[in-house]
Amino acid sequence: MDTTFFRRYSGVLVMMDSKTDKVVSYHFVRMEKDIYYKLALNRLREKGYIIQSITCDGRRGLMKELFNTPVQMCQFHMVAIVMRKLRKKHQSQAGKELKIIAKSLVKSSKNDFYRRLYAWFIKHEDFLKERSDKGNEKGYFPYKHRNVRGAYASLKYYMNYLFTFEKHTEMNIEHTTNRLEGLFKYLKRQLNNHNGLTKKRKVMFIKDFLNKKSC
């Protein structure tokens, strides 16, 4: 499941069955919120759907509440989170090495990935603990390398969700939301071929497109 936006405050939340590639639910939204995903999931359950697993882009509040449903964090979104925290021109050696480890995620097993991540942490532990020499107005000495710490903290936070597909091999859980991303790109290309549509007709076009994908 994922949400895409066509302009500010104009998006659509879509849920797809990975086994059939069919859209099973979609809802127009103004912004991306956990509550919208919860409502969409509840509507599916009310219709009799059995939700065996969920692959999403890391909705923290939502993940905590889905106790009985295996949740897979999209690995490409995880890599993107790390890359945003460690910009393209990031200079520290620790940050550069962490970017390399993050990029290896989609081709790694859980054991291999976290063995490399733990080795990285041991190597750079002192670096991560470095604090500024100047205290702030509260007398607190902040950490120097907050971007690197933040990237590492994100990888640790999602640790239990990055390799759910390995734990439940019988379910064939998707480890990325690539199918939906591909659907969104195709939808937007089709919309671009119909420039000049009014807002109402654009909504009708999107509905027709997604309805055909649910057949």
Language-model segments: what does each one mean?
Residues M1-R60, K64-F67, Y158, R179:
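RNase H-like nuclease fold core
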Residues S18, L41-L44, I81, K89, ...:
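Short, charged/polar low-complexity linear motifs in solvent-exposed/disordered segments
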Residues D21, R84, K88-S92, K103, ...:
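Alpha-helix capping at helix-to-loop junctions
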Residues Y49-R60, L66, K96-C215:
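Acidic/histidine-rich catalytic cores and adjacent linkers
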Residues S53-K99:
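Conserved beta-strand -> loop -> alpha-helix junction used to position metal-binding or nucleic-acid-contacting
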